[in-house]
Amino acid sequence: MGSTMDKIKGQANELAGKAKQGIGEATGSDKLKGEGAIQEAKGHGQQALGNAKDAVKDTADKVAGAAHKNL
């Protein structure tokens, strides 16, 4: 999966998790609050993965560009 998709899915999971937590809070459902917290954390992780992929690609592009200039 590409970095953009990781970021989009991460944001979606974050928002869904926050919504679940809010509903759990409003209804007194500890189960729903817990599920929401887990889903939100998953979203943070997915976004971090997308950012890491971008950083690796940027570094690889810079290295390739520098190597090409030295040829």
UniProtKB/Swiss-Prot annotation:
Residues 1-54 are annotated as: Disordered. Coiled coil: none annotated. It comes from the Bacteria. Belongs to the UPF0337 (CsbD) family. This is UPF0337 protein RPA4418. It comes from Rhodopseudomonas palustris (strain ATCC BAA-98 / CGA009). The lineage of its organism: Bacteria, Pseudomonadati, Pseudomonadota, Alphaproteobacteria, Hyphomicrobiales.
